[in-house]
């Protein structure tokens, strides 16, 4: 945002320097990028009075002039056709460097000495006008600097405006901040409307199809205009803030845009048909030609302005070529509206039509101020173009502005900012921001936000405003208090814990995936995930990214699809990220949880001898999970069958002790097929917050290396297929066995099931026995094995 210091001073009596202003605004969160002096290049140009003007004796197209520049009279040869005696003109004396870089030197032109140059507007880079020299007002005093005469001695600040501060995209918005920072009064421009003729409030009827898309649309009629250039002061002011002057009518709309932040559009009223304006969405595939002469193909989500017969503007983005102001225009319909920011943003980005107007509509404009802005523009149009303003406003407002009401607790503000705050300071600050207060004598206030502050949505926003005005640099630095003992080896930091998990994944040879937090509602619906806990995005970049993910599966499955499209035959990836769920009990109405996603697909090993071409399966996924738990010193986990999962079948629940740490299983075939998978896809999603909590209670103890050798015995359990392996291993580990060390599954055999019989399988386990102080004897090992066999038979009903 370019801010003219002279323009700012029309709103606030600021007397300091540009640098002081920039530094203070920076501390308020409006960062100063650069200080510009836009007319420094013509600072040495002075006013000259042409005393005499005669034809050059050797050239018909040259004139020889004697010019009074205040301190001396110069002989200047000029080639402009419009130079004449008696004129007041801008003069560049010998030694002056022009904006183009040309340095003026004393010269002879066809034998006549020339000690300077009479300048045109284009040579001064004040406009594109190059037909002749620039003629100044007759009351101009010779020798006066041109920048002083035209009030061009200005300083412009380039301020970086954050996306949430749309109210600062105008001189008025920044003037509010300056008034707040320096405790200065704010003065609004004075309105002096001179209306003539009959009431025009019903001359153009306005219909709005959807009030959510267009809360208010209004316009005024101005008759008898002339499409003349705007005066020098307006052209130069617009140029100083980067806006190219065009004509008086168009320049006024741009002037109000920069001054008050309200985009406007001027229609040629005689080109509007049916005395009617309709605001509605376009038809899918509809074509419309904008002011730049380009035909645009529209979507059903684009908002159009129509008259009684045709589309006349792409709402909030650009007007139509069929109703633009031209040299023959005599009547103007001045449009002033407010549109839904998300709609304008989507249209502008899709069509690549970013403009100063769309930039402000995308971020939100002040609905309450819009009427004032329209009347201010109408007043200027009448003054500059000789028009007559008709009484009455053509207006439709289906959705009047509803001010946000927020709670504010001074005690909460003091706690959040870490300083002692006076209630009077908080009250005064909020009132200076334009807020109204009630209940200010109680611990909890009710604050009504002003219409121009769309970013004030919750108590924390008000506290931030109090902190801004107090001065973040005034908050004393204080070391954080240590509220618990520092224990070496504990990974209390989420960052440290996640770094540890990432190092584990990379060390295991897994590839790390990083996906967007945004997914589509349709992605979550396809996986059968509940809709009640979702957090929709108000202004999504695309319809495919309109909600925050509630699980990592959509992103990982899209990663799989992308890799398959690139010819991958096997994939083993992990992702550490947050998921987001709605939680009304939270201050932020959202709950954020850390998750680890694992995906295993296709070929287990890379191509090449001597590895076999095998596909990864459940045992690979389970092994990865078990390895992670061992690395975290969390001990063995129970994998219990779960029948009600939305996108995994079969699915097991991973339990560490009594805590559910996640799920694992095979992605349902129809879901896997939709992501172009032709083999089984195995996935796990693990709750990192639960693991981190469990890790805090783990005390790592040293275990001495065994001195005596182990003794191993195999045992085959013949059990119904419905008995899980974990039932056997958990039972054995839970027995009171003095010599037992470990149990692992080493073989599975599934014999044919006789007709009408119950499916069975033979599970062979390897039992490990060990004594820490001596070598075991076969007899005592066999006795322990027999205890295991007997206990399994009694507890699980299996055969040994």
From Swiss-Prot:
The lineage of its organism: Bacteria, Pseudomonadati, Thermodesulfobacteriota, Desulfovibrionia, Desulfovibrionales. Its main location: cytoplasm. One of its GO terms (cellular component) is phenylalanine-tRNA ligase complex. Residues 401-477 form the B5 domain. GO terms for biological process: phenylalanyl-tRNA aminoacylation. Residues 706-800 form the FDX-ACB domain. It is found in: Cytoplasm. PANTHER family: PHENYLALANINE--TRNA LIGASE BETA SUBUNIT (PTHR10947:SF0), PHENYLALANYL-TRNA SYNTHETASE BETA CHAIN AND LEUCINE-RICH REPEAT-CONTAINING PROTEIN 47 (PTHR10947). Pfam families: B3_4 (PF03483), B5 (PF03484), FDX-ACB (PF03147), tRNA_bind (PF01588), tRNA_synthFbeta (PF17759). Keywords: Aminoacyl-tRNA synthetase, ATP-binding, Cytoplasm, Ligase, Magnesium, Metal-binding, Nucleotide-binding, Protein biosynthesis, RNA-binding, tRNA-binding. InterPro entries: aa-tRNA-synth_II/BPL/LPL, B3/B4_tRNA-bd, DNA-bd_dom_put_sf, Fdx_antiC-bd, Fdx_antiC-bd_sf, NA-bd_OB-fold, Phe-tRNA-ligase_IIc_bsu, Phe-tRNA-ligase_IIc_bsu_bact. Binds 2 magnesium ions per tetramer. The gene is pheT. GO terms for molecular function: ATP binding; magnesium ion binding; phenylalanine-tRNA ligase activity; tRNA binding. This is Phenylalanine--tRNA ligase beta subunit. Tetramer of two alpha and two beta subunits. Its EC number is 6.1.1.20. Mg(2+) binds at residues 455, 461, 464-465. It comes from Oleidesulfovibrio alaskensis (strain ATCC BAA-1058 / DSM 17464 / G20) (Desulfovibrio alaskensis). It catalyses: tRNA(Phe) + L-phenylalanine + ATP = L-phenylalanyl-tRNA(Phe) + AMP + diphosphate + H(+). Belongs to the phenylalanyl-tRNA synthetase beta subunit family. Type 1 subfamily.
């Amino acid at each position: 945002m370019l801010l003219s210091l002279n323009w700012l001073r029309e709103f606030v009596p600021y007397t300091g320097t540009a640098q002081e202003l920039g530094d203070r605004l920076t501390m308020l969160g409006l960062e100063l990028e650069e200080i510009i002096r836009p007319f420094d290049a013509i600072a040495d140009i002075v006013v000259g009075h042409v005393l005499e003007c005669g034809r050059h004796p050797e050239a018909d197209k040259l004139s020889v002039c004697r010019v009074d520049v205040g301190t001396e009279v110069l002989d200047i040869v000029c080639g402009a056709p419009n130079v004449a005696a008696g004129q007041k003109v801008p003069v560049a004396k010998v030694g002056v460097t022009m904006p183009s870089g040309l340095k003026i030197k004393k010269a002879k032109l066809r034998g006549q000495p020339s000690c300077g140059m009479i300048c045109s507007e284009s040579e001064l880079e004040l406009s594109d006008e190059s037909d002749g020299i620039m003629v100044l007002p007759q009351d101009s005093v010779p020798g006066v600097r041109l920048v002083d005469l035209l009030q061009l001695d200005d300083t412009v600040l380039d301020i970086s405006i954050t996306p949430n501060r749309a109210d600062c995209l105008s001189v008025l918005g920044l003037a509010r901040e300056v008034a707040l920072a320096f405790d200065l009064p704010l003065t609004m421009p004075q309105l002096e409307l001179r209306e003539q003729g009959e009431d025009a409030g019903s001359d153009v009827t306005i219909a709005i199809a959807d009030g959510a898309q267009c809360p208010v649309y209004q316009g005024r009629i101005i008759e008898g205009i002339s499409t003349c250039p705007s005066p020098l002061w307006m052209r130069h002011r617009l140029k100083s803030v980067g806006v190219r002057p065009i004509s008086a009518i168009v320049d006024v709309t741009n002037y109000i845009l920069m001054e008050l932040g309200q985009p406007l559009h001027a229609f040629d009223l005689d080109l509007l048909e049916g005395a009617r304006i309709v605001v509605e969405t376009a038809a899918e595939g509809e074509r419309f030609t904008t002011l730049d002469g380009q035909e645009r193909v529209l979507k059903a989500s684009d908002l159009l302005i129509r008259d009684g017969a045709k589309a006349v503007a792409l709402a909030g983005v650009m007007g139509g070529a069929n109703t633009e102001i031209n040299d023959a225009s005599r009547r103007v319909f001045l449009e002033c509206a407010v549109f839904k920011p998300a709609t304008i943003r989507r249209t502008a980005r899709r069509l690549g039509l970013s403009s100063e107007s769309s930039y402000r509509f995308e971020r939100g404009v002040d609905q309450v101020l819009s009427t004032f802005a329209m009347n201010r523009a109408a007043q200027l149009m009448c003054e500059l173009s000789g028009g007559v303003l008709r009484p009455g406003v053509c207006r439709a407002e289906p959705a009047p502005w509803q001010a946000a009401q927020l709670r504010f607790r001074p005690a909460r503000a003091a706690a959040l900012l870490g300083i002692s705050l006076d209630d009077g300071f908080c009250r005064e600050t909020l009132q200076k921001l334009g807020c109204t207060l009630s209940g200010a004598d109680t611990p909890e206030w009710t604050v009504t936000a002003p219409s121009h502050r769309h970013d004030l949505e919750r108590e924390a926003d008000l506290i931030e405003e109090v902190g801004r005005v107090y001065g973040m640099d005034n908050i004393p630095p204080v070391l954080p208090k240590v509220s618990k003992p520092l224990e070496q080896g504990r990974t209390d930091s989420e960052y440290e814990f996640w770094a540890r998990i990432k190092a584990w994944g990379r060390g295991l040879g897994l590839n790390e995936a990083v996906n967007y937090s945004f997914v589509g509602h349709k992605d979550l619906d396809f996986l059968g995930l509940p809709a009640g806990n979702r957090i929709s995005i108000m202004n999504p970049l695309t319809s495919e990214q309109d909600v925050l993910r509630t699980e990592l599966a959509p992103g990982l499955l899209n990663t799989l699809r992308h890799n398959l499209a690139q010819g991958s035959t096997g994939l083993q990836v992990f992702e550490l990220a947050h998921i987001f769920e709605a939680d009304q009990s939270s201050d932020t109405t959202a709950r954020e949880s850390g998750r680890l996603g694992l995906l295993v697909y296709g070929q287990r090993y890379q191509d090449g001898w001597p590895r076999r071409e095998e596909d990864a399966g459940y045992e690979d996924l389970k092994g990865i999970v078990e390895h992670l738990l061992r690395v975290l010193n969390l001990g063995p986990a129970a994998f219990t069958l779960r029948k009600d999962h939305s996108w995994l079948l079969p699915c097991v629940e991973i339990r560490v002790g009594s805590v559910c740490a996640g799920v694992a299983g095979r992605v349902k075939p129809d879901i896997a097929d939709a992501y172009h998978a032709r083999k089984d896809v195995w996935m796990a999603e693990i709750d990192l917050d639960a693991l981190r909590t469990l890790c805090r209670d783990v005390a790592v103890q040293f275990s001495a290396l065994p001195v005596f050798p182990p003794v191993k015995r195999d045992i085959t359990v013949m059990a119904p297929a419905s008995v899980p392996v974990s039932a056997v291993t958990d039972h054995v580990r839970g027995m009171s066995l003095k010599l037992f060390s470990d149990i692992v599954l080493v073989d599975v055999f599934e014999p044919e099931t006789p007709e009408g019989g119950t499916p069975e399988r033979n599970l062979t386990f390897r039992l490990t026995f060990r004594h820490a102080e001596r070598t075991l004897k076969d007899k005592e090992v066999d006795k322990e094995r027999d205890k295991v066999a007997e206990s399994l038979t009694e507890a699980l009903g299996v055969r040994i």
